[in-house]
Amino acid sequence: MQLNSTEISELIKQRIAQFNVVSEAHNEGTIVSVNDGIIRIHGLAEVMQGEMIALPGNRYAIALNLERDSVGAVVMGPYADLAEGMKVKCTGRILEVPVGRGLLGRVVNTLGEPIDGKGPVEHDGFSAVEMIAPGVIDRQSVDQPVQTGYKSVDAMIPIGRGQRELVIGDRQTGKTALAIDAIINQRDSGIKCVYVAVGQKASTIANVVRKLEEHGALANTIVVVATASESAALQYLAPYSGCAMGEYFRDRGEDALIVYDDLSKQAVAYRQISLLLRRPPGREAFPGDVFYLHSRLLERAARVNAEYVEKFTNGEVKGKTGSLTALPIIETQAGDVSAFVPTNVISITDGQIFLESSLFNAGIRPAVNPGISVSRVGGAAQTKIVKKLSGGIRTALAQYRELAAFSQFASDLDDATRKQLDHGQKVTELLKQKQYAPMSVAQQSLSLFSAERGYLEDIEIAKVIDFESALLAYANREHADLLKEIDQSGGYNEEIEAKLKALLDSFKATQSW
């Protein structure tokens, strides 16, 4: 078969017309060095600060240093097989994590990937890990309580929904225990919880997850994990990921509680990244923006007003305020609260619960030091009955501390001083509480009422805990309706006062402790 020139030219024109060229513009770069999880890239002219950079093998790095002739990026995950000359691409996206109710009851890593072996995570979409905190106009004052279940905290250092309350102390003083008990106490409160574990041993985290499951609190909690064996980048980003997951509930008119355990390790991970990126070191070798590291995280914990929620949900949720309450944990060295990171976080938060190793070792647990622990905004949120009955507790403890110091040097004490010392010791004993045993508002009120109204005066110090246990058992058995009424209303009036007095009088008459 012979084709003439006209047919050939027509065929060529037809093929040219059918030829479809798809052009894609990629912003590509080349790795010029790999060192301790930090890669230097040449050629990414249009990269953004914080942008995800696609690496070979379905991995990502985050651009942190934008320099004149190169980009410094931190690899999220293993980097041993990365080498000079490899090609990388800009993605045009910043880091996002899955958010939604499907994450409740799950254990995930910094990127929101499940690590509990329960299959894929169901989510309602993705949210950027770095978000701007709500402005002043979008906020509402804190006036609803978060009950931790600890008498000493709820009575003297109350926490409100939308507050940032620092938990600070040396290692092994019960910081994590306090935070975990606060999460366990939210089982029936409707508050969703997020627990962020940074730089801890995997065995410790597994134990925490098991305890949450045992006490029925895991179904209400998201656990975000960046263990000590993971890269500094994942440890640095874990609190931001957890915060994004908590903000999902805040922005939809619900209440959430987030625990950062702990921010000291996050600061150390960020210091490591900054030094490897050759950023100039400052005090304690931390970079200059370590304050901003924590302030931009903790400012996202807030109580937002109904207008903000309605606007965010496009009118789907009306008349509801949302909140995200933060309990950041900081570990001190030998009780030094004036170190760089502790002072930073103290100045950012709305108060601190200071746990002392000397109190912990003396058997006073939770080891709260009421002298330097404070809640700056929680007073307005405190339950009415607890607020009324706890007024004299802090004063009694402060006087007891002062007199106890002087009584070591004085041989003979007058009756009034001896009485104050005795009352202070009994209040200290009454505020002791076992782990994983949070108390309801009614139970706390009953204990505080007994101390406030002098029912402990004729009880021996060694018998105070037995007295309280027997009192609560008696109240549950004989006056369950009164406890239920106090738990539901949280109010305090002459009628409730009379009922509490009658309850304690009848219990004292039984002498059964």
Curated annotation (Swiss-Prot):
Broad enzyme group: translocase
Transmembrane parts of this sequence: none
Membrane topology designation: Peripheral membrane protein
Subcellular location: Cell inner membrane
Residues the record marks as site: Required for activity: 373
UniProt superkingdom: Bacteria
EC number: 7.1.2.2
Main localization of the protein described in the UniProt heading: membrane
SUPFAM superfamilies: C-terminal domain of alpha and beta subunits of F1 ATP synthase, N-terminal domain of alpha and beta subunits of F1 ATP synthase, P-loop containing nucleoside triphosphate hydrolases
Key words, A-Z: ATP synthesis, ATP-binding, Cell inner membrane, Cell membrane, CF(1), Hydrogen ion transport, Ion transport, Membrane, Nucleotide-binding, Translocase, Transport
Keyword Protein transport included in the entry's annotation: no
Residues noted as binding ATP in the record, renumbered to the chain: 169-176
Catalytic reaction annotation: ATP + H2O + 4 H(+)(in) = ADP + phosphate + 5 H(+)(out)
One example GO MF annotation: proton-transporting ATP synthase activity, rotational mechanism
A single GO cellular-component term on record: plasma membrane
InterPro entries, sorted: ATP_synth_asu-like_sf, ATP_synth_asu_C, ATP_synth_asu_C_sf, ATP_synth_F1_a_nt-bd_dom, ATP_synth_F1_asu, ATPase_a/bsu_AS, ATPase_F1/V1/A1_a/bsu_N, ATPase_F1/V1/A1_a/bsu_N_sf
Pfam families reported for this sequence: ATP-synt_ab (PF00006), ATP-synt_ab_C (PF00306), ATP-synt_ab_N (PF02874)
Subunit note: F-type ATPases have 2 components, CF(1) - the catalytic core - and CF(0) - the membrane proton channel. CF(1) has five subunits: alpha(3), beta(3), gamma(1), delta(1), epsilon(1). CF(0) has three main subunits: a(1), b(2) and c(9-12). The alpha and beta chains form an alternating ring which encloses part of the gamma chain. CF(1) is attached to CF(0) by a central stalk formed by the gamma and epsilon chains, while a peripheral stalk is formed by the delta and b chains.
Function: Produces ATP from ADP in the presence of a proton gradient across the membrane. The alpha chain is a regulatory subunit.
Family: Belongs to the ATPase alpha/beta chains family.
Protein name, per record: ATP synthase subunit alpha
Taxonomic lineage: Bacteria, Pseudomonadati, Pseudomonadota, Gammaproteobacteria, Enterobacterales
Gene from which the chain derives: atpA
